[in-house]
């Protein structure tokens, strides 16, 4: 398994920390390969416990039947699911150290998670119905008026289920990269955090800003997933 470049001060390997981030941001970019051409699909995935997986986790979801991803030979080798990024540009003007020596340059901060595993296809109506029930429960839970599958006419729902195919990824490895200026001084990191907080125009900028406030130059590998605020480096 060839892993992406991850500086030690940015990488997060604690499974539960990564799982919490994935649960909060379930829309994945699912990258598969047919041996010739890579394919990227946006697919909501639910992370579930699975004792049979190397990490104890699996991702479940579904794709349109018209999507060739699920057909035999369209997903050779490992599949990669990426979650995020929550991101924001970082201006060097936000660093207090700029006024001291000007040895600063722009960068980008972000929160992103990756999961690798073997993709399995489940073209079974009962299995797919179960996945839809779990996804619906996760997405609708906590809403004042949650939608439930039983609210839809049975014949309509049965017809819709014939148009999708279930997928499952047994997760072999899962890690995140939280690039939150943790290698810089506390003053520079907090300066960047405050700069991002004043703009809040990047995707996930508020959450990123919160993460930067939680980070320190000595701790990111087990950094907690933060509240709904966004920010990047």
Kindly label every feature range from the protein language model.
Residues 1-233:
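Binding-site signature for planar aromatic cofactors or substrates
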